[in-house]
């Protein structure tokens, strides 16, 4: 346990594998505990291309930003001290305490793991000084026995804090009893002794059918099952691109507007487009697929603009996109904005080797990568006159955040000094992530697309209930919260 944290409370949520629902469970617990306590989320190391920028310009995984929001506190870099952003070719950009540190292979990263260990200890200590409860999340499967000697996010966090542990398994994948039991058996003894409860997640159907299995699992492990969480559609931003596969092909079929988002190989921050799912059918189109007949096309952000531009061209998707030029809006966000330009000049910062690439040529910009520097900032911009799509909201403010390397020149900005539009105003690029979180932007885009089809705009379908309260209520209904409070040493929630 870290120094001077004897009076601080910790809870660690581990999983049997990736995508079992650890982040959602932590989010629910953060909202529940925040009713009576000052709570902070923590994940020592996150690997994700969906990230968030804090108010002081630090980059963290979006899951920890979501969890902080659920807890009612401001996200900070200490909540996710290490963020790994895969770039391809077994190399990731390492973000330490919200700042770009270096591009490293897995081997090089683990060679310096002791230094990283010190970073997370410092982050935890600072959180302990400010919060009275820290709800921590592991990564992937907890029982990665080949990594025990250098793991910082599961075994490392467990040993540093000596926290009570909840282990989560995903029944939707099948084999949940074996995965829970096997994970427990493979954990080191000093960690295994702190596993105080089990959760089965994403169950469809009547949980009564599981009762005999739950009883036997408890007898085999000596660990209580805290509950069975039902499968339901979360209304909080997704953590990583694995979640794209959860989006049904039938989602949004009842909407009149069809938006095609290009699923780049290294797609990042696709959460940008989830707000549009309340107003349109949003499809993620693989590079090898046909675009169909979209009302708008969006090229999203990417962790590696040059590599994904090459993939876009070689797959033929670039030509497919250009075939819609002048017919439907074509929007580019961050790396997608860079690809829409005339050219990209890379000194080796982005792609590893110096190169000059032709872009799609739909915007009059050139992007230059000449320094290992990243712009990370929250911004407020004013909508400028840029064409028919956003003409109805000219002069209004929009908020967003920037996460990018490279500098783009533009003679016709769209949002303050940001972005670029072509002469028709139908091709627009911007560095603003979170653009469609702005109600005025969503309404302007969807209204324009509906008007083109001779249809009337309808207000978006958003349930009245706060999505974090909704998730917390599902947890309260299906988990033994008294046991969870008890394992931490806290009084149950005051109702």
UniProtKB/Swiss-Prot annotation:
GO molecular function, one term: ABC-type vitamin B12 transporter activity
Entry-linked InterPro entries: Class_I_gatase-like, CobQ/CobB/MinD/ParA_Nub-bd_dom, CobQ_GATase1, CobQ_N, CobQ_synth, GATase_3, P-loop_NTPase
Pathway named in the protein's UniProt entry: Cofactor biosynthesis; adenosylcobalamin biosynthesis
Catalytic residues identified in the record: 334, 433
Short name of any one Pfam family annotated for the protein: CbiA
Organism superkingdom: Archaea
PROSITE patterns registered for this protein in UniProt: GATASE_COBBQ
UniProt-listed GO biological process terms: cobalamin biosynthetic process
Domain GATase cobBQ-type: 256-441
Keyword tags: Cobalamin biosynthesis, Glutamine amidotransferase
PANTHER family the record matches: COBYRIC ACID SYNTHASE, DETHIOBIOTIN SYNTHETASE
HAMAP family to which the protein is assigned, alphabetical: CobQ
Family in the record: Belongs to the CobB/CobQ family. CobQ subfamily.
Task of the protein: Catalyzes amidations at positions B, D, E, and G on adenosylcobyrinic A,C-diamide. NH(2) groups are provided by glutamine, and one molecule of ATP is hydrogenolyzed for each amidation.
Descriptive protein name: Probable cobyric acid synthase
Organism: Methanococcoides burtonii (strain DSM 6242 / NBRC 107633 / OCM 468 / ACE-M)
